[in-house]
Amino acid sequence: MYIQMKDVVKKYGEGENTIFALDHASLELEKGEMCVILGPSGSGKSTLLNMLGGLDSADDGTIIVDGCDLSSISKKELREYRRNKVGIVFQTYNLIGELTVRENIKVVRDISAAPLSIEELLKDLGIERHAAHFPEQLSGGQQQRCAIARALIKNPAILLCDEPTGALDSKTSRDVLQLLQKINVKYRTTILLITHNENIAPMADRILRIHDGRIVENIINTRKPVKELDI
């Protein structure tokens, strides 16, 4: 099993004031799976992604990725894990305004252990014509594609997407989701995607539903092409 979470707990406060962001959450994913995570705000979705991304630590339980126990590795190993194993895409694009599209991607490539080709990635993401443009010259969808390219250039084993289409219109959302399906197939990248949009769920191999820090549904799904979804 590529990703294993077992009885993971993340809590804030003590005694009667304790709030569980994750409450004994367990999950197993195979390499190359695409997983959509559903749930209301505050349910623990982002906490789960932060744990897998090495951005936060569990109070209890174990998280193992590709045989590596994230709770027992050194700080140096954790930094290398975040740098080389994990790509993260947020709803906000987090681009460097004074750099072109190509330069934004190159910044990440230059600190990565086994990066992909910038030119191939630009072509895969359909933004090769915008390589010399600055972020302010791009549409929202083009900026999100650039953000995805920044996350992918390091050739990560895991891509974590936190509401990546939340700020996009329906057509652009569809384009970005089709792109993620393409990436998943071409690079065998394990993708976990948070969304409030129930209609997106059928695009995934696995559908998780989180409520009050607990995984209350874990459904194996026969994925559908994004073009067939009512987004």
Feature map (PLM): residue ranges:
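Conserved beta-strand-loop-alpha-helix hinge in the C-terminal portion
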Residues: 214-231
